[in-house]
């Protein structure tokens, strides 16, 4: 019974870590997409990074 509890806790921890890494990855990807679109419309990179980190 104790082993099962330890296993479940470990499993849940791994799942939550994977989920947060995944969502952080999605946010980073969205930010770089934003910067690329912004630069393409003629702004400089510094302005775009500031603009995209605010949204």
Curated annotation (Swiss-Prot):
Transmembrane segments: none annotated. It is found in: Secreted. One of its GO terms (molecular function) is toxin activity. Its main location: secreted. Disulfide bonds join 34-48, 38-52. Keywords: Disulfide bond, Neurotoxin, Secreted, Signal, Toxin. One of its GO terms (cellular component) is extracellular region. The keyword Ribosomal protein does not apply. Expressed by the venom duct. The keyword Transmembrane does not apply. Residues 1-20 form the signal peptide. It comes from the Eukaryota. Probable neurotoxin. The cysteine framework is XIV (C-C-C-C). This is Conotoxin Cal14.14. It comes from Californiconus californicus (California cone).
